[in-house]
Structures are given as structure tokens and as C-alpha cells.
């Protein structure tokens, strides 16, 4: 994915759609993909249009009382519509149907190819299919938005990462005990500090993440790599862990 750059024009290819599955504030760090579930095979997407109603603001004693005067009234984020390749066995599309059946308000975000995002909240107002003879069957969805969205323009100042490190690069841990690794991004004020960490061999060590710290738990003696990848996939680092018997 390109480094976020909100100052350059960008085409729509590469735009992705995500639904929030966490319990926190979806607006807190929208550039992070932690607690977000991506919907696959998006064919087209039309974000909600911001509109405002008008109200009559004319008075009998206006200087130009014979001319209509209006003011901006209640605002709306409209409806977001999108089309997916229909895959009834795919977990994300099953969750979409559950979202419609439950009728609750959920957050979702649109990540654009330049790395910026729009975040909306809404409920699924329609869900259907389009079936043609010569093209794949598609799932059509419309979400009616609720409240004020968080737009990419609200976060126009983006500090992109230039690097990522994991320290220490190698260390040891006794079987049954744990050690920690620290992830850092450069420069210090990076906007998106999200990352993913896994154990290359869970029979030897397992990992858990809290903030910028990775906790490695020793399971069995041997060597194991802990690959760490930045949230946007631009940077990667590997820490080597030696698990000792005692």
C-alpha cells in the first residue's frame, strides 16, 4: 500500500472496505486495521454524500423581505452503497447478513489507495443480489449512515513511517517463562503505529501483543522467529528467539 499522501490525486483502484468488530472507539485510530474486518472482492463503492436540509430564515422586516432567505439545517451522511462478488461461504459476507438481521448501528471505514480513510457509522438498510448470465453474481448492499462521519480531510496531516525496528533482535527465554520485544517506528511522531506479530512455530513459542510490546512465551526448547509486519505492509522485521530447557 502506498505511503499515506493526502496532497496528491489518486485513482480508486485499490480501495478497500472494512467493518469494525472491536469494542472500543472506532474513531480513535482509524488508520490502524486492528479490530477491523476487511470485506473481500469489492466491485464498486459509493460513499455516503454529506447533505444538509434548509430552513426558512426570512423575516417580515428584512431589508429584502420579498426575497427568500434560508439557512443550513440538519445534516446527513446519506447512504453508502457497495457491490461485492457474491461468496455466501465467506465470513465477511455472512457477517453482513447478520448485521442486517440484527439491525444495529456499526462502524465501517473506507481505506483509499493513498492510505487515508473515511469512517462512518450506520445500519444495513438493504441487501440483495444481482444475477446475470455472463458475469459473476454480485451482492449489493446499502448502509444508511448515522451521525457525523470522520472524513479523511479531518486528518489531513499524516506523518508516514520511514522505518520500523524490533528490539532486541535476538534473545533467549526459558521454557514456561516469557520475554518481551519492543516495536518502534521512525520517525517518532508516526501517525499509524499498527503492526502484526506472529510466531513462526507455535510449538516452540507463542506471542501476544499489548501496545508496542510483544510478549513471547517459551513453549519448547529450540529456535523460533517472530516476524513483525507494519499495519500497511510497508515494513517488516524479525526477532530470533531461543527457547532453552532451563
Curated annotation (Swiss-Prot):
InterPro entries: Big_2, Phage_TTP_N
Compartment(s) of residence: Virion; Host cytoplasm
GO BP annotations, alphabetical order: symbiont genome ejection through host cell envelope, long flexible tail mechanism; viral tail assembly
Main location: virion
Assigned keywords, A-Z: Host cytoplasm, Viral genome ejection through host cell envelope, Viral long flexible tail ejection system, Viral penetration into host cytoplasm, Viral release from host cell, Viral tail assembly, Viral tail protein, Viral tail tube protein, Virion, Virus entry into host cell
Superkingdom classification of source: Viruses
Keyword NADP carried by entry: no
Location of the BIG2 domain: 161-239
Domain Big-1: 204-246
Gene Ontology CC terms, in alphabetical order: host cell cytoplasm; virus tail, tube
Function: Forms the phage's tail tube composed of 32 hexameric disks. When it encounters the appropriate initiation complex gpM and gpL, it assembles in hexameric rings that stack on top of each others. Multimerization ceases when the correct tail length is achieved through a mechanism dependent on tail terminator protein.
Assembly and interaction partners: Multimerizes into a structure formed by 32 hexameric rings stacked on phage baseplate gpM and gpL. Does not multimerize in solution without the tail initiation complex. Soluble major tail protein interacts with tail assembly protein GT during tail assembly.
UniProt protein name: Tail tube protein
Organism listed in the record: Escherichia phage lambda
Amino acid at each position: 500500500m502506498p505511503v499515506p499522501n493526502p496532497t496528491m490525486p489518486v485513482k480508486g483502484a485499490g480501495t478497500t472496505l472494512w467493518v469494525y468488530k472491536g469494542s472500543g472507539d472506532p474513531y480513535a485510530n482509524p488508520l490502524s486495521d486492528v479490530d477491523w474486518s476487511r470485506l473481500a472482492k469489492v466491485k464498486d463503492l459509493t460513499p455516503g454524500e454529506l447533505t444538509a436540509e434548509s430552513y426558512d430564515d426570512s423575516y417580515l422586516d428584512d431589508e429584502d423581505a420579498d426575497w427568500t432567505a434560508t439557512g443550513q439545517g440538519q445534516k446527513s451522511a446519506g447512504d453508502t452503497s457497495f457491490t461485492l462478488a457474491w461468496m455466501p461461504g465467506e465470513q465477511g459476507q455472512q457477517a453482513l447478513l447478520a448485521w442486517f438481521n440484527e439491525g444495529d448501528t456499526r462502524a465501517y471505514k473506507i481505506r483509499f489507495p493513498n492510505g487515508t480513510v473515511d469512517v462512518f457509522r450506520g445500519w444495513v438498510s438493504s441487501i440483495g443480489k444481482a444475477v446475470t448470465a455472463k458475469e459473476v453474481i454480485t451482492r449489493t448492499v446499502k448502509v444508511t449512515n448515522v451521525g457525523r462521519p470522520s472524513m479523511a480531510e479531518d486528518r489531513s496531516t499524516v506523518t508516514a513511517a520511514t522505518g520500523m525496528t524490533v528490539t532486541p533482535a535476538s534473545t533467549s527465554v526459558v521454557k514456561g517463562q516469557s520475554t518481551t520485544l519492543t516495536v518502534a517506528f521512525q520517525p517518532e511522531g508516526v501517525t499509524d503505529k499498527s503492526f502484526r506479530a506472529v510466531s513462526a512455530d507455535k510449538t516452540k513459542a507463542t506471542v501476544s501483543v499489548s501496545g508496542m510490546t510483544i510478549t513471547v512465551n517459551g513453549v519448547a526448547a529450540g529456535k523460533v522467529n517472530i516476524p513483525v509486519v507494519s499495519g500497511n505492509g510497508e515494513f517488516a522485521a524479525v526477532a530470533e528467539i531461543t527457547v532453552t530447557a532451563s
